[in-house]
A protein has these predicted regions:
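Specificity-determining recognition surfaces
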Residues: 126-154
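Short, solvent-exposed loop/turn elements at beta->coil junctions and helix N-caps
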Residues: 29-32, 96-97, 139-142
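Structured loops at beta-to-helix junctions and adjacent beta-edge loops in soluble globular domains
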Residues: 16, 45-46, 114, 157
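Non-catalytic DNA-recognition/assembly elements of restriction-modification systems
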Residues: 1-26, 151, 155-158
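Short, solvent-exposed beta-strand edge segments and adjacent coil->beta transition regions
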Residues: 58, 106-108, 149-151
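Sequence-specific dsDNA recognition surfaces
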Residues: 14-32, 46-76
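A short beta-sheet element
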Residues: 44, 64-128, 145
C-alpha cells in the first residue's frame, strides 16, 4: 500500500476486464485427446506459475478439437489467472510467447482488458501480490469463484 501513498483509487476486476471461463462442456478434452505436439497448446496449471508462463511440460489439442471448443481461447495481451488448486498464479500472453494458439483449462480464467490503455505490467504486479486467501472457498481443493473474482478491488495510482 505504501506504493501509492494516499492517492489511490480502487477498481473492481469486473470493471477492468472481461472474465472468460474455459469451455467445460461435452467437448472438454479427455486425456487421450492431449498430445505432446499439435495445433493448440492446452494450458494446465503447471504452465501458469507465480512467475508467469512455464512451458516445461506441454499438452496440445488438434485443430479439430480447438474448433469444437467455444470459449477459453487466448488473444494477445490477455492475462491468465489460476482459480483452482493453486489460486492466484498469473501469466501474461504478450508477443514474447511464441505459441499462436492457446486455450485455458477448467482451473483458470482469462482476464481480457476492457480498455486498451491499461498498464498491464502494473496490473500483473498487483494481481500477483494480491491476497486471495480472503476470497477462496473450499479446503481440499481451494477455488476462486468468478462471482468473488469480479468483486476484487485493485489499487491504482491516482
Amino acid at each position: 500500500n505504501e506504493m501509492f501513498g494516499e492517492n489511490k483509487i480502487f477498481e473492481s476486476i469486473d470493471n477492468l476486464f472481461d472474465i472468460i471461463d474455459g469451455d467445460r462442456g461435452k467437448n472438454y478434452p479427455k486425456s487421450d485427446e492431449l498430445f505432446s505436439e499439435e495445433y493448440c497448446l492446452f494450458l494446465n496449471t503447471k504452465n501458469v506459475t507465480k512467475n508467469g508462463f512455464s512451458f516445461d511440460t506441454k499438452q496440445f489439442i488438434t485443430k479439430t478439437k480447438d474448433k469444437l471448443l467455444r470459449k477459453g481461447k487466448l488473444e494477445r495481451y490477455d492475462i491468465v489467472l489460476t482459480t483452482r488448486g493453486t489460486v492466484g498464479n498469473v501469466a501474461y500472453y504478450d508477443e514474447l510467447i511464441k505459441y499462436k494458439h492457446l486455450r485455458i483449462n477448467s482451473g483458470m480464467v482469462i482476464l481480457r482488458p476492457k480498455t486498451p490503455n491499461l498498464n498491464q505490467k502494473f496490473i500483473i504486479h498487483v494481481l500477483r501480490n494480491n491476497n486471495y486467501s480472503r476470497v477462496i472457498s473450499g479446503s481440499a481443493q481451494p477455488q476462486l469463484p468468478i462471482t468473488k473474482l469480479k468483486k476484487i478491488l485493485l489499487p491504482f495510482p491516482h
